Amino acid sequence: MKFSSIILLTLLICSMSKFGNCQVETNVKCQGGSCASVCRKAIGVAAGKCINGRCVCYP
């Protein structure tokens, strides 16, 4: 039981470090849905949204 909890904790820590930074902030000003082309150029995926006047992209 102790060994399995150590393994579970290790997997949790590793997954947090790998997937913890799941958004890419840009310094490009935006309005509404104008972030698709910015995100496509920045990370290759058109998934993003305008937050506080700046584009935030999600890989």
Curated annotation (Swiss-Prot):
The modification Pyrrolidone carboxylic acid is found at residue 23. InterPro entries: Scorpion_toxin-like_sf, Scorpion_toxinS_K_inh. The keyword Signal applies. The record marks 28 as: Hot spot residue in hERG blocking currents. GO terms for cellular component: extracellular region. Residues 1-22 form the signal peptide. It is found in: Secreted. Gene3D superfamilies: Knottin, scorpion toxin-like (3.30.30.10). Expressed by the venom gland. PROSITE patterns: SCORP_SHORT_TOXIN (PS01138). Keywords: Disulfide bond, Ion channel impairing toxin, Neurotoxin, Potassium channel impairing toxin, Pyrrolidone carboxylic acid, Secreted, Signal, Toxin, Voltage-gated potassium channel impairing toxin. Disulfide bonds join 30-50, 35-55, 39-57. One of its GO terms (molecular function) is ion channel inhibitor activity. Its main location: secreted. The record marks 49 as: Basic residue of the functional dyad. The record marks 58 as: Aromatic residue of the functional dyad. The record marks 40-41 as: Hot spot basic residue in hERG blocking currents. Blocks both human ERG1/Kv11.1/KCNH2 potassium channels (in a reversible manner) and A-type voltage-gated potassium channels Kv4/KCND (in an irreversible manner). The presence of the Kv4-associated proteins DPP6 or DPP10 is mandatory to have high-affinity blockade of Kv4.2/KCND2 and Kv4.3/KCND3 channels. In contrast, the presence of the Kv4-associated protein KChIP1/KCNIP1 does not enhance the affinity blockade. Negative results: has no effect on Kv1.1/KCNA1, Kv1.2/KCNA2, Kv1.3/KCNA3, Kv7.1/KCNQ1, Kv7.1/KCNQ1+minK, and on Kir2.1/KCNJ2. Has the structural arrangement of an alpha-helix connected to a beta-sheet by disulfide bonds (CSalpha/beta). Belongs to the short scorpion toxin superfamily. Potassium channel inhibitor family. Alpha-KTx 15 subfamily. This is Potassium channel toxin alpha-KTx 15.2. It comes from Olivierus martensii (Manchurian scorpion).
